[in-house]
Amino acid sequence: MSLSIIFMGTPEFSVPTLRLLVDAGHRIVAVYTQPPRPGGRRGLDLQKSPVHQAAELLGLPVFTPVNFKDPEERERFAALKADVAVVVAYGLLLPEAVLNGTRDGCYNGHASLLPRWRGAAPIQRAIMAGDAETGMMVMKMDKGLDTGAVALTRKVEIGPNMTAGELHDRLMQVGAKAMAEAMVKLEMNDLPLTPQPQDGVLYAAKIDKAETRIDFARPALDVHNHIRGLAPFPGAWFELEIGGKPERVKVLGSELAEGQGAAGELLTDDLVVACASGAVRLTRLQKAGGKPLAAADFLRGTPLAAGMRLS
């Protein structure tokens, strides 16, 4: 036996779930993903989403509505007569007509331990807040923002130096397995739902460019969490005066270090920077238009000395 599934997702994070559902023998009757976006060096080429590309390689039908406001779009969804819809980082709001448009509703894979970090950026926010643990949850969607009842939980430890990129890749695989397991249980009519707690609700707002600059006038642990929570994208950054003009440098890796000094002061020649309390060592950096480099390689091209100030 197998389920007939509508899959809804867009980025790379969603692809392993789609592939695992196909490998499990489920019938994917349609794949919904966001429309192609301008891309390429000049933004002239329309680029299909990772899910769109994966679906085409799997020979699956793909739909790319801008939204579900058009009644015909909602009718097309319902006409698929699927058992269930699986939603993983789709990126579009689903009206009630879609949420209720399959036999068993819509199940979402969300990258946090709900109700903590509902919303758009749960991976980054968990690290930026210094959380030691997160996870993947499969929930049955309702009309609220990540408020649905929970069907399955898989916890994941966040290492002290783990970046958002590393956690993304770990949760991507954990989430795929969790959703595949949930669909087996759903098919067996053995997927009980538990309402989310009323306490502990936090919202993971989308990352704003204005918050990406590093503030070395914060404690070292906060600076370290800020850096790794934004690595590799969009990247936390500081400004450095090179050749008489300020240049933006992204920091893609850091670790806590010993030392005290004025906030932003380079304490050593190997990129230990003083914070409000304590210090951080910058381990991976990237200048505008350049490649990410380990600290030693970065210093070969951009000599920095103790006593300089980063801002």
Curated annotation (Swiss-Prot):
Recorded hits in InterPro entries, A to Z, give: Fmt (IPR005794), Formyl_trans_C (IPR005793), Formyl_transf_N (IPR002376), Formyl_transf_N_sf (IPR036477), Formyl_transferase-like_C_sf (IPR011034), GART_AS (IPR001555), Met-tRNA-FMT_C (IPR044135), Met-tRNA-FMT_N (IPR041711)
Q: Which GO terms describe its cellular component?
A: cytosol
UniProt-listed PROSITE patterns: GART (PS00373)
Annotated GO MF terms: methionyl-tRNA formyltransferase activity
Q: Which reaction is catalysed here?
A: L-methionyl-tRNA(fMet) + (6R)-10-formyltetrahydrofolate = N-formyl-L-methionyl-tRNA(fMet) + (6S)-5,6,7,8-tetrahydrofolate + H(+)
Q: Name one Pfam family in it.
A: Formyl_trans_N
PANTHER family recorded for this chain? Answer: METHIONYL-TRNA FORMYLTRANSFERASE, METHIONYL-TRNA FORMYLTRANSFERASE, MITOCHONDRIAL
**Could you identify this protein by its name?**
Methionyl-tRNA formyltransferase
Q: Which organism does this record belong to?
A: Rhizobium leguminosarum bv. trifolii (strain WSM2304)
